[in-house]
Regions:
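Short acidic loop-to-beta-strand element that houses the catalytic metal-binding Asp/Glu
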Residues: 94-99
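Active-site beta-strand-loop-beta-strand hairpin of nuclease catalytic cores
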Residues: 100-109
Length: 171
């Protein structure tokens, strides 16, 4: 996995949303997700994408990033904390956008795809597994970077991530 920096995506009244930008990549992870999902021609898939974007806005402006608003697909066995936006409380969709909820005020958006229908886990779905695995790896790296405090740390209020965009985080 390449080094990366965080990029601020949205600042809402309740939540700051960040994403990952890998060194050498043209797009951030979230921008790649939006571009790929935006190319879907199925009207239901377009509705699902719009619903995910609306959920981010609603969570960000109205509720805060409480865990009940995220789909718990955490892979505890592999020590990752990736979750998906949004939970079944907000919408029932096969679209998964993986993220790392650091607090009720800070979320890092990753990437995702449409999960295969049926009782199949994210770990076993060929479409979302690569995104889910990468998201879990990133949660561990980000948690470690926060713990180390060298390239990434909280501000005094624990509502803003402080980092230098010229100093990538090393996996």
């Amino acid at each position: 996995m390449n080094t990366f920096v965080l990029r601020l995506v949205y600042v809402h009244s309740q939540v700051r949303w960040y994403t990952v930008h890998f060194t050498g990549s043209e797009r951030t992870e979230y921008a790649d997700f939006l571009a790929r999902m935006g190319m879907e021609t199925d009207p239901k898939h377009q509705r699902d994408l719009n619903d995910v974007k609306a959920a981010i806005q609603t969570i960000g402006n109205k509720y805060g990033a409480h865990l009940r608003y995220f789909r718990d697909e955490q892979d505890i066995a592999h020590r990752g904390k990736a979750m998906a936006v949004p939970s079944t409380l907000v919408m029932r969709s096969q679209l998964r956008l993986y993220c790392h909820v650091l607090s009720t005020k800070v979320v890092i958006l990753f990437n995702g795809n449409f999960k295969t229908k049926g009782p199949i886990s994210a770990q076993d779905c060929l479409r979302v597994e690569p995104h889910f695995t990468k998201a879990n790896q990133l949660t561990r790296i980000i948690d470690q970077a926060l713990e180390d405090g060298e390239h990434l740390h909280w501000d005094n209020t624990r509502t803003v991530l402080v980092y230098d965009q010229n100093k990538p985080i090393n996996p």
